[in-house]
Amino acid sequence: MSRFKSDFLRTLDERGFIHQISDEAGLDELFAKETVTAYIGYDPTASSLHVGHLTQIMMLHWMQKTGHQPISLMGGGTGMVGDPSFKEEARKLMTIDMIEDNITSLKHVFANYLDYDRAENPALMINNADWLRGLNYLEFLRDVGRHFSVNRMLSFDSVKTRLDREQSLSFLEFNYMILQAYDFVELNQRTGCRLQMGGSDQWGNIINGIDLGHRMGTPQLYALTSPLLTTSSGAKMGKSASGAVWLNKDLLPVYDFWQYWRNTEDADVVRFAKLFTTLPMDEIARIATLGGSEINEAKKILATEVTAILHGRAAAEEAAETARKTFEEGALAENLPSIEVPTSELDAGVGVLSLIVRAGLASSNGEARRHVQGGAVKINEQGVSDERQIIGTGEVTGDGVIKLSVGKKKHVLVRPA
């Protein structure tokens, strides 16, 4: 029996999204009796988000699905300052044009999880630059700044960590906490927003906004955070051996995204199915009973369902079929990731280590060399034992490609161009 009566909090609870709530009973009552507006903030520091952001995105997804209104708040204003939370050094400052380009790109990612066009409870994307860029500094200090205690701000873990390490914390970054708190108050005044959600590392910042709202006369505001997500082996979500796992197919092919989830550790399959898919809980309970070799089927279901939300069902099933042909039939699948190498270079010959790095299967020649020495590298299914081997047009198959493999699960087609 769930401790919550509202559909939204009950869904988050049974799927493992909840770490901390500022007023559990009060927030549950609010969700049970009215349509609630809530937001999560994102600083547009890149043109795409990665899988480390998926927990919060899915919280917004479930909010809309249970009849409430989610806001994805773009930090067009705060992004010009940079969040100092648990960072070892100041972030590189971005121009307005860079930030706006990133926001445009991010909306395409969010649109796969949220519906901005529906008639009832449409999702909103709001840019805090709309109010932050026009602030009068003296009025802001007088009306907002006076509510903040520097002593208290210095006690926050995110600040203390920097200061304890004797790392510089600029006045610019220090202001970030005030601006983020003000966002909550401004959103309440503009949209009636009552809840801010985020990762557990944002708890202090969110409580700041609640306190500011109380001092400035808003209705009761609430905080809800999700746990810091790591794999069962302790690895942080969002990165793979080959780099960030982006939510933008221009940065990461659909097949690679699918494969990332297919490689989930056994102990994480059920937890990730709850968090990152919309599978019914009874279907997830069935998956939880799978063991032994059946766990691989569960991983394929997980990979296909997560990929279908982001890239569409057809693309997800195509990726699954590509994997099946590659691994189960040993066939050459045209939908494998590919790179182009000028024919002139192949005529002259390309070193295998260089080719591995260019294909994104290793980050350096040293890593590529270790793959060769470990017997993990194959060209057209033939093992490579010599790190000095030269790859040329002679290796191009009748299909017009060279299949480069590292291990059993990483394959790239090299196409002469």
Curated annotation (Swiss-Prot):
<feature type="short sequence motif" description="'KMSKS' region">
    <location>
        <begin position="236"/>
        <end position="240"/>
    </location>
</feature>
<feature type="short sequence motif" description="'HIGH' region">
    <location>
        <begin position="44"/>
        <end position="53"/>
    </location>
</feature>
<comment type="similarity">
    <text>Belongs to the class-I aminoacyl-tRNA synthetase family. TyrS type 1 subfamily.</text>
</comment>
<keyword id="KW-0436">Ligase</keyword>
<feature type="binding site">
    <location>
        <position position="180"/>
    </location>
    <ligand>
        <name>L-tyrosine</name>
    </ligand>
</feature>
<feature type="domain" description="S4 RNA-binding">
    <location>
        <begin position="350"/>
        <end position="416"/>
    </location>
</feature>
<comment type="subunit">
    <text>Homodimer.</text>
</comment>
<dbReference type="InterPro" id="IPR024107">
    <property type="entry name" value="Tyr-tRNA-ligase_bac_1"/>
</dbReference>
<dbReference type="Pfam" id="PF22421">
    <property type="entry name" value="SYY_C-terminal"/>
</dbReference>
<dbReference type="Pfam" id="PF00579">
    <property type="entry name" value="tRNA-synt_1b"/>
</dbReference>
<keyword id="KW-0067">ATP-binding</keyword>
<protein>
    <recommendedName>
        <fullName>Tyrosine--tRNA ligase</fullName>
        <ecNumber>6.1.1.1</ecNumber>
    </recommendedName>
</protein>
<dbReference type="GO" id="GO:0005524">
    <property type="term" value="F:ATP binding"/>
</dbReference>
<dbReference type="InterPro" id="IPR036986">
    <property type="entry name" value="S4_RNA-bd_sf"/>
</dbReference>
<dbReference type="GO" id="GO:0005829">
    <property type="term" value="C:cytosol"/>
</dbReference>
<keyword id="KW-0694">RNA-binding</keyword>
<keyword id="KW-0648">Protein biosynthesis</keyword>
<dbReference type="GO" id="GO:0004831">
    <property type="term" value="F:tyrosine-tRNA ligase activity"/>
</dbReference>
<dbReference type="GO" id="GO:0003723">
    <property type="term" value="F:RNA binding"/>
</dbReference>
<feature type="binding site">
    <location>
        <position position="39"/>
    </location>
    <ligand>
        <name>L-tyrosine</name>
    </ligand>
</feature>
<dbReference type="InterPro" id="IPR002307">
    <property type="entry name" value="Tyr-tRNA-ligase"/>
</dbReference>
<dbReference type="InterPro" id="IPR014729">
    <property type="entry name" value="Rossmann-like_a/b/a_fold"/>
</dbReference>
<keyword id="KW-0963">Cytoplasm</keyword>
<keyword id="KW-0547">Nucleotide-binding</keyword>
<dbReference type="InterPro" id="IPR024088">
    <property type="entry name" value="Tyr-tRNA-ligase_bac-type"/>
</dbReference>
<dbReference type="InterPro" id="IPR054608">
    <property type="entry name" value="SYY-like_C"/>
</dbReference>
<dbReference type="InterPro" id="IPR002305">
    <property type="entry name" value="aa-tRNA-synth_Ic"/>
</dbReference>
<dbReference type="GO" id="GO:0006437">
    <property type="term" value="P:tyrosyl-tRNA aminoacylation"/>
</dbReference>
<keyword id="KW-0030">Aminoacyl-tRNA synthetase</keyword>
<feature type="binding site">
    <location>
        <position position="176"/>
    </location>
    <ligand>
        <name>L-tyrosine</name>
    </ligand>
</feature>
<feature type="binding site">
    <location>
        <position position="239"/>
    </location>
    <ligand>
        <name>ATP</name>
    </ligand>
</feature>
<comment type="function">
    <text>Catalyzes the attachment of tyrosine to tRNA(Tyr) in a two-step reaction: tyrosine is first activated by ATP to form Tyr-AMP and then transferred to the acceptor end of tRNA(Tyr).</text>
</comment>
